Amino acid sequence: MGITVMARIDNYEQRFGGIGRLYTPDSLARLRQAHICVIGIGGVGSWVVEALARSGIGELTLIDMDDICVTNINRQLPAMSGTIGKLKTEVMSERVKLINPECTVNIIDDFISPENQSDYLNRGYDYVIDAIDNVKTKASLIAYCKRNKINVITIGGAGGQTDPTQIQIADLSKTIQDPLLAKVRSVLRKDYNFSQNPKRKFSIDAVFSTQPLIFPQMTEGCSTSATMNCANGFGAATMITATFGFFAVSRVIDKLLKKKS
């Protein structure tokens, strides 16, 4: 074995030895071979990518087409003065390589949609993490993964909340206090033949919070419905958006290691 290869192995083990000591060396080796897709690299998804990179995941695929805006600074990991206007996927890819130089990072500079999901999702992922906030796209993505036996976890709305202790994971059929996931659930039942029986599980993990939403104060000349769709919409804090992401990654790693053990 060459010196360069040995140095790379030693470097990886030095960087992520703490993960191996926590989960076992064999588990770290499995994470090193894992390929995870993150869809939506925003207030939640950027923290998902960070946690995956720092867990020694060997390959990541990042799907998003948004650039970084100054209004993202309150909650999105890559948003800083020097990154405004840059693509979120590119900034996060560069960051991942600084954390783990041997990680393969694939960038898909596009928004996932029903029209392209068959292409973007059939790439041998060990897990897909859904961190998008469009109801129809979210439902279509979940249904596609379910139908094609692709492991997926979905993440609910992280805005309008302040208490990270109320975040939890449950089956998508059982979430409460989350309007986004409630709408997704309705679309899945209406358009994708998911069970109408409230007692039957969807077998899809979902991250959500039980905290009642905190609505922003009304802005003059902007109705409640309009406020939720403009720059004065739900407020959001890093402590919440990051925790949503960390919950998702924790569950994904747990499932990956249990599946392969």
Swiss-Prot record:
Entry keyword Nucleotide-binding: yes
Xref: Pfam families: ThiF
Bilayer disposition of the protein: Single-pass membrane protein
Main localization of the protein described in the UniProt heading: membrane
Domain of life: Bacteria
UniProt cross-references to InterPro entries, sorted A to Z: ThiF/MoeB/HesA, ThiF_NAD_FAD-bd, Ubiquitin-activating_enz
Gene Ontology cellular-component terms listed: membrane
Membrane-spanning parts: 230-250
Gene Ontology molecular functions: ATP binding; tRNA threonylcarbamoyladenosine dehydratase; ubiquitin-like modifier activating enzyme activity
CDD domains: YgdL_like (cd00755)
Subcellular location: Membrane
Keyword Membrane: yes
EC number: 6.1.-.-
Keyword set, alphabetical order: ATP-binding, Ligase, Membrane, Nucleotide-binding, Transmembrane, Transmembrane helix
Enzyme class: ligase
GO biological process terms, semicolon-separated: cyclic threonylcarbamoyladenosine biosynthetic process
Role noted for this protein: Catalyzes the ATP-dependent dehydration of threonylcarbamoyladenosine at position 37 (t(6)A37) to form cyclic t(6)A37 (ct(6)A37) in tRNAs that read codons beginning with adenine.
Family statement: Belongs to the HesA/MoeB/ThiF family.
Name used for this protein in its record: tRNA threonylcarbamoyladenosine dehydratase
Organism listed in the record: Haemophilus influenzae (strain ATCC 51907 / DSM 11121 / KW20 / Rd)
Gene coding for it: tcdA
